[in-house]
Every structure is written in structure tokens, then in C-alpha cells.
């Protein structure tokens, strides 16, 4: 403190000495000399003042941007753009929605209108317009009608460097009058600096890119898109005039909220163009009466395609941005991703189509009448039930108590539960809910009914991946992003029998082959129950509740998803070894070292499973999922490139044999994936394999499908695990989930643009692999005596395959066909068409766990 006092005392002493010297200059001088000295002194004082402001002398004026720290490299908040693999802009990340453009990307009429209206001497001044300043001062003094004197360059300085906020925080800036003087001084200084560094063309382009047009539209590119759904280059003269007119007051002259004001202001701008020779009088007369036609839509962060995928990309880049010093929402990055918009649309359409049917089945199954929601007893049964099919008490109440609105009711009525109960259970009010046909709809119902309505929707996830590159080509996180933002692709759920992939892969690693046999018989063992904290006897059963007692080839056991064989293999190979194999292939979720892991008891997510199945399709080479291929900064420099390396994590022989097992799901008699033929049976140039999965009580239904160049996976289930179907006929993976993949594959492989995904798995490349390892007789259960006419556990609609493993369509004798036709029954061709139309209705009699 003493040092500061001494400094000010020294400065005061020097100032007094200067005043004494300065006073001596006037003594004995002529009047004109005194006048010249006074003028020179004012000029010098003003220059010294500007210098003091620029260097923030004694912290009195606040910081200013230097040439190297700001002027040469101006930083503005720019939206980061995200692009698909097929070159489409699919969304943005932004705080201020701004995307810069080049001078040549804007119609010349916009710049003409801008200069004619905002700064007519723009091309003549050096950042400050003395004529404009004196004219504004004269109007203020004589007419008490002040007008703006800021040049375009000064406005750019204000927009780009925020001189009215962060650069006016000096000590003197706290004094209102001095604050205004300092702000204008800084604008002048920065404007002159900008004029010395940039050309007029660069300055006016930077201004067009930084100015605020209202409605969260920053810059000419975003404004043109928001108000007219066009590009800056395609703006008409009238549209350009509307946007320029808004700059005086974005709210008052907004064409959407104040159309009359905007209309008058537009014509003023057009007249200014006539005055300066940039628009003919005849053209003005044509334009002045034209109405303003808007195509208005405010762009939000969540607008665009692949919304769940874009959120996944944001999470993926969070750490990278932090490490590299970028802000995803302000740095103006261009992010190039692996997603394909055409495949994404196929995936979203497939999910919506199948889930609409699943939801209809679920509603009928539980007697839920959604159209009557909020009107009496619209739910016939409560579907939230435990593993013993008992209704879970207070289930909906528990969900409600976690919601903000319920917490607000408790805070408002802390000692009045009747009021809370009224507003929760009795007060009917408009609520926005989801509808498959209309998207978001408004219904009148109570808060309790709205929770029931939204909770009883079934959900899904889907992902498609290239096994050779890890590139994610399609990503569906749920049925509707606006209502459910939680991404089910990365949600962890029990995989059921789809986890058997790792059990059998480890078996192949340890020398077994698809033609080796294991007995399907009763098995029990002592295991530790984590819920009860005690040892208990675990008796895994097959889906049909019985055991054949036969020795079954592994290819048949895998295709039919026989649990007893999988559990036996798990014990034989070792659960720890199976966990190691799963981790190598792409599973990062924690896995429990317990015998039930062989049946998929530990939670994993769909992306991990797709990655692991891709390892098999890629001949044992693992590639991490790739979402982003490269990132380019706002200067055009590539600052990130996605990974391209893969690693051989399982032997080629094991991968090849697993490819045969997966294909067996479709080719083996009784294979649980056979209904996929109803979707891909026409594509004989491509081989497919699949694995279904369904957990206890049908809470989770899965399907994983592999082909040589494309792997897809899907999950279907309730938001809560207690919401599910009660029967395998409706709830198993082959019924609920397989069609999602089927519809997608049908669209992709039927599209000539994706011919590159067609193909067959490679022939064996290892001399150690012989045909007798994977080609052998399939298991056929022995006929049972004293049973029903059709034994659902033994009977499976037979699909006959040719030498290439493709289904053979049997011919119906002509006489028989004619007879059926005459009797009014469907012919073979009609049946085939019907089967194609509803492939989900093919009978599947194995309830795959």
C-alpha cells in the first residue's frame, strides 16, 4: 500500500511540474500562438489518452486486443458442423448458431444494401468516419435527434471483441459517463487496427459473419437459412433488404413478429440502394409492393438426422476437446463421421415400422387402450410385474417421486398431502405425449396417467457397423429422441443367448469344432446368490423346459440355442477364459465370474456386442467402433483422424468356425434365426448368420446378424425390466427384434447404392481347417411316443437348403394347386407372397433364452 501511495505522489509531483512548464509557454505569446499551442496540446493529449486506453494504463481502462493477441487472429463463437460419410450436413453443435462464409458465397445485393444503409462511406474511411461523427453531433445538438455514427468496421469491433463487456472492466469503466467514452474510444482504436490489417472485402465479410440477426441466428448464412430456408448466395434483393433492415433493431424489425415494421424498413433499405445507384427505380417499384414471404424455422442443437448418434459423438469428443483446447460448441470445427444418411433412414424406418407392431402387440397383450388414456380405466392390467408375475406395488408412484414436477408439489405443499395427491392424481391438464402416427400429441390427462402412458411404451436400439473398419453406419438410440433422450445403444442390459458367442468362441480357441458333440442333459451346481448372500443350487433349463438326453453337434446346439450345452461348455472352458475372450473381442462392461454368464446374465450394451460380432466377421481381427473419421478446424487444418488399425485377437480358425456356427442359425433345422430368410432370401450373392437372445421373463430381446461386410444388432425391451411380454410367442428375440434387422437389411441390400456390402465369407485360408470340422449331419430329435400330434419342442417348419446353404422353395403340383384354388384356398404363390408380406408370423417354436 505504501508503494502505491508513493507512486501516486510521484506522479502528482511530475504533473504539477508539467503544468508549471506548460503555463510558461503562454507568457508573452501572441493569441494565435496560444491558440495553436492549445490545439496541439489537445491533439497530443487525445493521442496520449488513446494510447493509455489501448495499453490499459494503470488498469484504468480495461484490456484491449493487441495485434498478435486478437486482431490478427480474431476468435468468434462459431458452430461446429457434423457431416455424414455421404457428405450431408446432419447437425450442428453451438451456443451461438454461426457458420462463416466467404465473400463470394454471398449475393452482392446484400453487401450493397448493407453499405448503402449502414455506412455509405465505408470504402473511403479508415475505420472512423469523421463526417459521420460531426453530422451525428450536429443533429444531437441542433435537433436533439441523435443518429448512429458507427461505421461497419466499428460495429465489427463491437461484435467481435465485446468492447461493451469484457474490455470495459477497468477502474474508470465503473463511472457511467467515462464508461461510454472508453467504449467508443476502444471501438475507434480497434476499428483502425482492423483497417490496417484487413482489406475492405475481408472486413465486410467478417461483419456479415458475426452480426446478430435475432432468433439465435448469427451471421448471414444462418440468417438466410432461418428466415428464408436458402443460402446467402441465393438471397433475392428483397430478402437481402429484409435482413439488412433488421440490423437496426432485430426485434422491432423482425419480419416474423413485426411484419409491418419489417415491410417498411425493407423498403427504406431498397430506396437507399436506389439513392446510391445500386438499384434501378423501376426495379424498386416492382419490389416495394411485394409481400415478405418467410420460410421460418429456428435451428436447434437437436435438429437434423441421427440425433442419438450426434449426442454419442459429442460424448466421444468431450475428452478430446478438453485435451486439445477446443470447445465443441464455439470452435467452428467440421466433424466428419462414419454415419451414412441413407442407411440411417433405413434403420430409423425399420425400427419405427417394427416397434409400432410390437407396441400394438404389447397393448393388446396387457389390454392397454391408449386412445382412451385419461378417461376412466384405460389400462386393463398393470404390466409392471416381478419375476413371479406379481404386480409391483407403488411402481408408478416411485417413478413420479423422482420427477421435478412432483418434487415441486412437495415443496409447495409440504404439510398438505391431499393437495399433492389432487394435483398428481386428479387434476386433468394438457400433456404432450408420444404417438406413433403423429409424433408428439397433446392429450388431457392427469400427471399419474401421463406417467403410465409414457412408461408402458416398448423401446428399441439398433446399430450397423462395418467389421473391417469399425465404421458405424447407422445408429438408432430409441423410437423418438424428443421424448426419450436416453440412448439405448449404450444402455447396459442382459444379452441372453447372444452372449453364447463368446462361450463357443472360447471352445473353438481350445480346439473344439462345430461337429464335436456335447450332451443335452440336466445339470445343476452350487452358486453364490448375490441377492440372498448365500449359496444356492442353480438348475439351468432349456427354453422348452426339457432335455433330450442326446449328444448334439455344437453347430446344432448353437443354432437351436440349447442352454444345457452352453452351460456345460462354460464350465468345461472356464468362465474366466470366456471373460478374457469377450474382453478381447470388444466387451468393456464388467462381467461376473459366475456360471450363469454362459447364458448372458451380465449386462452389456449393444455397441459392444456389435463390435464383438464384427470381430468374427472380420476373421478374428478386432477394430474399435469408429464414429469420427476426421476433424477440421476453422482454418481448414486437419486436427484429428480416426483410428484405422485392427488387431488379431482370436485365431483365424476360431473366427472361421464361428462364422459357420452363426450361419447355422439360419441353415440348421430348428435354427432360431431362420425367419431372417423372409427378409434376405432374395440376396443369394451374400451370406448371413445370426443369433437371437431373450432374457428371463422376456425382459430383453436381442438379435445380432453378421454378413462379410456388414454387422447389425438390435435390442427391444421396456424402459424398466419389469415391463415385458409374458409369453415367448410375443416376447422372444426372433419375434420382436429380428424384424428390425430384417427390414433394415432388406432395404440396404435392395439398394443398388450399397452393392459393396454384398458378398460371401472367405473360403478357409488355414490348411488346418478341414470340411469335416464344420460339415456334418445335423441333429434331428427322435420322434416321441404318446405325445400330441405336433410336439412344439421337436417340430420346426423344415427349410430345405441347396448346396450353397440357400433355402429351396418347394413346388406345389399343378393339380393340387388347381384343387386348392378351386376350393377357395390360397395357392403356393399366394402363400409365398403372404409370407413375404408378414415374415414375422413364421412359426418359431424355440423360446430362445
Feature-to-residue mapping (PLM):
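Peptidoglycan glycan-strand catalytic modules in the bacterial/periplasmic cell-wall system
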Residues: 9, 76-285, 302, 308, ...
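Active-site SXXK
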Residues: 113-115, 273, 347, 469-470, ...
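N-terminal type II signal-anchor transmembrane helix
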Residues: 1-83, 121, 141, 358
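Short active-site loop at a secondary-structure junction
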Residues: 99-104, 451-460, 483-502, 515-518, ...
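Non-catalytic structural connector segments
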Residues: 145, 280-338, 342-418
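Conserved catalytic neighborhood of penicillin-recognizing serine enzymes
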Residues: 142-168, 233, 297-308, 512-578, ...
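Short, well-structured active-site flanking segments
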Residues: 123-133, 218-220, 280-285, 508-532, ...
Amino acid at each position: 500500500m505504501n508503494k502505491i501511495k508513493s507512486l501516486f505522489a510521484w506522479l502528482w509531483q511530475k504533473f504539477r511540474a508539467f503544468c508549471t512548464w506548460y503555463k510558461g509557454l503562454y507568457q508573452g505569446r501572441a493569441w494565435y500562438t496560444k491558440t495553436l499551442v492549445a490545439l496541439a496540446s489537445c491533439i497530443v493529449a487525445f493521442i496520449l489518452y488513446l494510447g493509455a486506453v489501448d495499453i490499459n494504463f494503470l488498469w484504468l481502462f480495461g484490456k484491449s486486443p493487441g495485434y498478435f493477441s486478437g486482431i490478427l487472429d480474431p476468435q468468434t463463437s462459431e458452430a461446429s458442423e457434423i457431416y455424414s460419410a455421404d457428405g450431408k450436413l446432419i447437425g450442428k453443435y453451438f451456443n451461438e448458431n454461426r457458420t462463416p462464409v466467404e465473400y463470394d458465397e454471398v449475393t452482392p445485393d446484400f453487401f450493397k444494401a448493407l453499405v448503402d444503409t449502414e455506412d455509405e462511406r465505408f470504402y473511403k474511411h479508415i475505420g472512423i468516419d469523421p463526417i459521420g461523427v460531426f453530422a451525428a453531433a450536429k443533429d444531437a445538438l441542433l435537433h436533439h435527434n441523435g443518429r448512429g455514427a458507427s461505421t461497419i468496421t466499428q460495429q465489427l469491433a463491437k461484435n467481435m471483441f465485446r468492447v461493451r463487456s469484457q474490455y470495459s472492466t477497468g477502474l474508470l469503466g465503473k463511472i457511467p459517463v467515462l464508461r461510454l467514452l472508453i467504449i467508443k474510444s476502444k471501438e475507434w482504436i480497434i476499428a483502425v487496427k482492423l483497417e490496417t490489417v484487413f482489406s475492405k472485402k475481408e472486413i465486410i465479410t467478417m461483419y456479415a459473419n458475426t452480426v446478430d440477426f435475432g432468433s439465435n441466428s448469427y451471421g448471414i448464412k444462418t440468417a438466410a437459412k432461418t428466415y428464408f430456408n436458402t443460402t446467402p448466395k441465393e438471397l433475392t434483393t428483397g430478402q437481402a433488404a429484409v435482413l439488412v433492415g433488421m440490423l437496426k433493431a432485430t426485434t422491432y424489425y423482425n419480419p416474423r413478429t413485426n411484419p409491418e415494421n419489417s415491410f417498411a424498413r425493407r423498403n427504406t433499405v431498397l430506396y437507399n440502394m436506389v439513392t446510391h445507384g445500386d438499384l434501378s427505380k423501376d426495379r424498386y417499384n416492382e419490389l416495394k409492393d411485394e409481400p415478405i414471404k418467410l420460410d421460418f424455422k429456428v435451428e436447434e442443437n437437436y435438429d437434423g438426422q441421427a440425433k442419438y448418434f450426434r449426442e454419442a459423438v459429442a460424448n466421444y469428443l468431450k475428452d478430446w476437446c478438453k485435451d486439445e483446447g477446443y470447445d465443441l460448441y464455439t470452435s467452428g470445427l467440421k466433424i466428419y463421421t462414419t454415419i451414412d444418411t441413407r442407411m440411417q433412414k433405413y434403420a430409423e424406418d425399420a425400427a419405427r415400422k417394427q416397434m409400432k407392431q410390437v407396441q400394438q402387440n404389447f397393448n393388446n397383450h396387457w389390454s392397454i387402450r391408449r386412445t382412451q388414456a385419461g378417461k376412466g380405466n384405460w389400462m386393463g392390467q398393470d404390466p409392471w410385474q416381478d419375476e413371479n408375475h406379481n404386480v409391483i406395488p407403488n411402481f408408478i408412484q416411485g417413478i413420479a417421486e423422482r420427477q421435478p414436477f412432483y418434487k415441486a408439489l412437495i415443496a409447495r405443499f409440504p404439510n398438505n398431502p391431499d393437495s399433492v395427491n389432487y394435483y398428481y392424481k386428479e387434476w386433468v391438464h394438457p400433456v404432450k405425449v408420444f404417438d406413433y402416427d403423429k409424433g408428439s400429441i397433446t392429450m388431457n390427462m392427469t400427471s399419474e396417467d401421463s406417467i403410465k402412458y409414457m412408461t408402458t411404451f416398448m423401446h428399441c436400439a439398433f446399430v450397423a457397423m462395418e467389421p473391417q473398419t469399425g465404421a458405424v453406419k447407422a445408429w438408432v438410440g430409441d423410437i423418438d429422441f424428443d421424448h426419450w433422450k436416453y440412448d439405448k445403444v449404450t444402455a447396459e442390459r442382459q444379452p441372453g443367448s447372444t452372449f453364447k458367442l463368446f462361450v463357443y468362441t472360447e471352445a473353438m480357441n481350445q480346439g473344439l469344432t462345430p461337429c464335436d458333440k456335447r450332451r443335452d442333459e440336466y445339470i445343476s451346481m452350487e452358486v453364490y446368490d448375490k441377492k440372498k448372500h448365500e449359496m444356492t443350487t442353480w438348475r439351468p433349463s432349456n427354453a422348452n423346459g426339457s432335455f433330450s438326453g442326446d449328444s448334439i453337434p455344437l453347430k446344432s446346439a448353437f443354432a437351436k440355442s440349447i442352454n444345457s450345452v452352453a452351460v456345460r461348455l462354460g464350465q468345461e472352458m472356464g468362465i474366466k477364459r470366456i471373460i478374457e475372450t469377450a474382453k478381447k473381442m470388444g466387451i468393456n462392461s464388467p462381467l461376473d465370474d459366475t456360471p450363469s454368464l454362459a447364458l448372458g446374465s451380465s449386462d452389456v450394451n449393444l455397441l459392444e456386442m456389435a463390435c464383438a460380432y464384427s470381430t468374427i466377421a472380420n476373421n478374428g481381427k478386432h477394430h474399435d467402433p469408429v464414429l469420427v473419421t476426421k476433424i477440421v478446424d476453422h482454418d481448414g487444418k486437419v486436427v484429428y483422424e480416426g483410428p484405422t488399425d485392427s488387431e488379431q485377437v482370436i485365431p483365424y480358425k476360431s473366427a472361421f468356425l464361428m462364422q459357420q456356427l452363426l450361419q447355422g442359425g439360419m441353415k440348421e433345422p430348428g435354427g432360431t434365426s431362420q425367419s431372417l430368410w423372409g427378409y434376405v432370401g432374395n440376396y443369394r450373392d451374400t451370406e448371413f448368420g445370426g443369433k437371437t437372445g431373450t432374457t428371463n421373463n422376456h425382459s430383453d430381446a436381442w438379435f445380432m446378424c453378421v454378413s462379410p461386410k456388414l454387422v447389425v444388432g438390435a435390442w427391444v425391451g421396456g424402459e424398466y425390466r419389469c415391463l415385458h411380454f409374458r409369453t415367448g410367442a410375443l416376447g422372444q428375440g426372433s419375434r420382436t427384434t429380428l424384424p428390425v434387422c430384417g427390414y433394415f437389411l432388406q432395404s440396404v441390400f435392395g439398394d443398388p447404392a450399397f452393392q459393396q456390402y454384398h458378398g460371401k465369407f472367405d473360403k478357409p485360408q488355414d490348411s488346418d481347417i478341414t470340411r469335416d470340422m464344420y460339415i456334418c449331419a445335423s441333429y434331428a430329435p427322435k420322434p416321441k411316443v404318446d405325445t400330441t400330434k405336433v410336439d412344439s419342442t421337436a417340430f420346426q417348419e423344415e427349410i430345405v437348403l441347396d448346396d450353397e446353404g440357400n433355402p429351396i422353395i418347394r413346388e406345389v403340383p399343378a393339380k393340387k394347386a388347381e384343387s386348392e384354388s378351386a376350393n377357395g384356398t390360397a395357392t403356393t404363390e399366394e402363400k409365398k407372397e403372404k409370407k413375404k408380406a408378414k415374415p414375422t408370423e413364421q412359426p418359431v417354436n424355440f423360446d430362445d433364452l
